[in-house]
Amino acid sequence: MKTIIEPFRIKSVEPIRLTSRPERERLARAAGYNLFGLHSDDVLIDLLTDSGTGAMSSLQWAAVMQGDESYAGSPSFFRFEAAVQNLMPFKHIIPTHQGRAAEAILFSIFGGKGRRIPSNTHFDTTRGNIEASGATGDDLVIAEGKDPQNLHPFKGNMDLARLEAYLEAHHAEVPLVMITITNNAGGGQPVSLANIRAVADLAHRYGKPFVIDGCRFAENAWFIKTREEGQADRSIPEIVRDCFAVADGMTMSAKKDAFGNIGGWLALNDDDLAEEARGHLIRTEGFPTYGGLAGRDLDALAQGLVEIVDEDYLRYRIRTHQYIVERLDAMGVPVVKPAGGHAVFIDARAWLSHIPPLEYPGQALAVALYEIAGVRSCEIGTAMFGRQPDGSEKPAAMDLVRLAFPRRTYTQSHADYIVEAFEELAATKDALRGYRIVKEPKLMRHFTCRFEKL
């Protein structure tokens, strides 16, 4: 059959409150035109993030009921640990309440003033934790990854020549090398297995640990299977194990590719580093066999790790994004191509070319999409990444709007509604105005800053 259906049945539903455009315009204004400030029950289709917003399966809910809440040595932890190590062969699995907590622990060890940490592209919380430690995060994605229209199959790849030159120039300041799979800030683009191995080889040649931000490891493995030469006949678990076999550690938000509503982990091979990390964990998160999570959460994540590598699910998920990208591209909306793993990315800078980057075209598009259709999205551009360490403002490499799809939550009719919203937007986009920021915090401003229309 040509039609790819949702490979699940719906057992429980949550009603969506329908709102009018005047109501949404009032709500956006009251939130300072920051969509993070909206109440979720004022949103029709919530594509702000795919993190922790998906639907758990009946087997995950069953696993919740066997959760053991012992403070230390819970069997829930050991089931969780075994599920992680089945896919990621690390010696030490350190649970955290979500991915940014794992990052905070990692950079409390490896960060510090004067240090520099390369990656393909650091996402917002990673960069925030790096900078909070006093270090600097540098992005070394390939040139194709900065071109929304380029059809390179692995636009998340790290530029190996730039990485080698970087390690030569900054050897003393670099405590580790990272890579993010998939590359969220670059359009949800995948990293090839060959590139992961080559980055690991370079890091180890220069005596640096190699750490993977693995939030969307299963989606990345699907792209490896379907796009990389020699991988088509291999299973998703086999590909996942190969990706992590060359790494010295990983950070993980289990709110993405573990079907969790909460949770994460830091994984390490080095005994001394793991001991130091557990010390930070006990001080900030909890005992090492729960790490800020309830036992029921650990059991739900263990089951989620079994389900996330199912090929029928991955085929459906990736095809959903491809469908929307194809429809938008056909109507002339500039989108990041090829379609990413967890989201559809709109090139707001290209579509709203009359709005300069320092007037936040991505924010203008995101607000308009909410006001017109009730769809909440997220700006990934100058509002998120434009402020420099010295307080100055610089345009980001791209101004994107991300439509991040919660897992197993929306259906085909929701996808068609989103396409229809862009059809309506196309008729009025040239009248949209830019924004200025009137209030912002020092770190990760996009979460809580307030805007005014120009």
From Swiss-Prot:
Name of the protein described by the UniProt record: Tryptophanase
N6-(pyridoxal phosphate)lysine PTM sites in chain numbering: K256
InterPro entries: ArAA_b-elim_lyase/Thr_aldolase (IPR001597), Beta-eliminating_lyase (IPR011166), PyrdxlP-dep_Trfase (IPR015424), PyrdxlP-dep_Trfase_major (IPR015421), PyrdxlP-dep_Trfase_small (IPR015422), TNase (IPR013440), Tryptophanase_CS (IPR018176)
Catalyzed reactions: L-tryptophan + H2O = indole + pyruvate + NH4(+)
SUPFAM superfamilies referenced in this protein's UniProt entry, alphabetically: PLP-dependent transferases (SSF53383)
Subunit structure comment from the entry: Homotetramer.
PROSITE patterns assigned: BETA_ELIM_LYASE
Gene3D superfamilies: Aspartate Aminotransferase, domain 1, Type I PLP-dependent aspartate aminotransferase-like (Major domain)
Molecular function as annotated in GO: tryptophanase activity
Cofactors: pyridoxal 5'-phosphate
